Curated annotation (Swiss-Prot):
<comment type="similarity">
    <text>Belongs to the alanine racemase family.</text>
</comment>
<dbReference type="InterPro" id="IPR020622">
    <property type="entry name" value="Ala_racemase_pyridoxalP-BS"/>
</dbReference>
<feature type="active site" description="Proton acceptor; specific for D-alanine">
    <location>
        <position position="35"/>
    </location>
</feature>
<dbReference type="InterPro" id="IPR009006">
    <property type="entry name" value="Ala_racemase/Decarboxylase_C"/>
</dbReference>
<feature type="binding site">
    <location>
        <position position="305"/>
    </location>
    <ligand>
        <name>substrate</name>
    </ligand>
</feature>
<keyword id="KW-0663">Pyridoxal phosphate</keyword>
<dbReference type="GO" id="GO:0005829">
    <property type="term" value="C:cytosol"/>
</dbReference>
<keyword id="KW-0413">Isomerase</keyword>
<feature type="modified residue" description="N6-(pyridoxal phosphate)lysine">
    <location>
        <position position="35"/>
    </location>
</feature>
<dbReference type="InterPro" id="IPR001608">
    <property type="entry name" value="Ala_racemase_N"/>
</dbReference>
<feature type="binding site">
    <location>
        <position position="130"/>
    </location>
    <ligand>
        <name>substrate</name>
    </ligand>
</feature>
<comment type="pathway">
    <text>Amino-acid biosynthesis; D-alanine biosynthesis; D-alanine from L-alanine: step 1/1.</text>
</comment>
<dbReference type="GO" id="GO:0008784">
    <property type="term" value="F:alanine racemase activity"/>
</dbReference>
<dbReference type="GO" id="GO:0030632">
    <property type="term" value="P:D-alanine biosynthetic process"/>
</dbReference>
<dbReference type="InterPro" id="IPR011079">
    <property type="entry name" value="Ala_racemase_C"/>
</dbReference>
<dbReference type="InterPro" id="IPR000821">
    <property type="entry name" value="Ala_racemase"/>
</dbReference>
<dbReference type="InterPro" id="IPR029066">
    <property type="entry name" value="PLP-binding_barrel"/>
</dbReference>
């Protein structure tokens, strides 16, 4: 028999979360962002749950080809654009929209001389300072793109650095509007946080990512508690052993946890080789949460490669074989991430290939 650990991808949750975005931005079209293999969920697994989107946004050409192979006929956006001129024919072959964020990418399009017309999203750097033309360069870049015979539609695009924080987006919106004043074309700027909290940024297209998977843009689960978002990934295992500790007994490598009373500790078949965060805290006051048979308890000791240990004090009836939820329904992934010094995004993307993964489909009961 295989180890009892299993991940489940919930297509009904994905469809629900897409509908939440629709309600938040009813006048906008939606790029469903599925980069990084759909934030670790798997493009093949999420496709049915997200195919009501207006388009898909991703990074890799291989992911775009996969979507076409799955039957997607709508728009696909390469969020980082092309990386070499040899990619240009694939834009035509697979009918892809590409971001253009630098002089070099414009030059690639010129040199490749595609038949066109290609749809592009011209990226403006409004303060994130990763990709994009600076405001002083943007209008000239737009004029150049407009005169290129291979380019058809041009969407104005930017990305927010602080939509999930108190600083907000006003300074970036102001820079965007100044740089694009009187330039025709649609606009795409809202990420997940802006979809939820900045309706002035919704415009023609929105680009939700983490909220499609039920995670919080801020990393704080309570910030999205009233939105109706649902976790699209759950990670489950079982107790495979139980130890009865006496006061002074320690648990795990480094003896980081010391029992201050007689207590039962359960051993769970899950470790950092499965994608569970090694830095999850299992001592002190802010220990990582775990559900044992639906009851919330805490990690004890360090995370090992293949195992973790949990406090069974709230679960006196727990025994070998009792189900454990590492994250998912009833236990937000962001809560685990917060106790591990990271964010839910990273935990989603870090799910290990060795973990068996099943899909709760749109046509089956989502009961896992």
């Amino acid at each position: 028999m295989p180890r009892p650990i299993q991940a489940v991808i919930h297509q009904p949750a994905l469809a629900n979360n897409l509908e939440v975005v629709r309600r938040q931005a009813p006048a906008s079209r939606i790029w469903a962002v599925v980069k990084a293999n759909a934030y670790g969920h798997g493009i093949r697994r999420v496709f049915a749950g997200l195919k009501a989107a207006d388009g898909f946004g991703l990074l890799d050409l291989s992911e775009a080809v996969l979507l076409r192979d799955l039957g997607w006929q709508g728009p696909i956006l390469l969020l980082e654009g092309i990386f070499q001129a040899q990619d240009v024919p694939l834009l035509e072959q697979y009918r892809l929209t590409t971001a253009v964020h630098c002089e070099e990418q414009l030059r690639m399009l010129e040199l490749a001389r595609p038949k066109g017309p290609l749809a592009i999203q011209l990226k403006l750097n409004t303060g994130m300072n990763r990709l994009g033309f600076r405001p002083a360069q943007y209008r000239a870049a737009w004029e150049r793109a407009r005169t290129m015979s291979c380019i058809g539609s041009i969407v104005h695009m930017t990305h927010f650095s602080d939509a999930d924080s108190k600083r907000g987006i006003a300074h970036q919106v102001e820079a965007f509007e100044a740089a694009t004043a009187n330039l025709p074309g649609e606009v795409s700027m809202a990420n997940s946080a802006a979809v939820l909290w900045h309706p002035q940024a919704h415009r023609n297209w929105v680009r939700p990512g983490i909220i499609l998977y039920g995670g919080s843009p801020t990393g704080v689960s309570s910030d999205i508690a009233e939105t109706g978002l649902q976790p699209a990934m759950s990670l489950h295992s079982e107790l495979i052993g139980i130890q009865d500790l006496q006061p002074g007994d320690t648990v795990g490598y480094g003896s980081m946890f010391t029992a201050d009373r007689a207590m039962r500790v359960g051993v769970v078949a899950c470790g950092y080789a499965d994608g569970y965060p090694r830095h999850a805290v299992g001592w002190g006051e802010r220990r990582a949460p775990v559900l044992v048979d639906g009851v919330r308890t805490q990690l004890v000791g360090r995370v090992s490669m293949d195992m973790i240990c949990v406090d069974l004090t709230p679960c006196p009836k727990a025994k070998v074989g009792t189900p454990v939820t590492l994250w998912g329904h009833g236990l937000p992934i962001d809560d685990v991430a917060a106790a591990s010094g990271t964010v839910g995004y990273e935990l989603m993307c870090a799910l290990a290939p060795r973990v068996p993964t099943s899909v709760a489909t749109l046509t089956t009961a989502d009961a896992v």
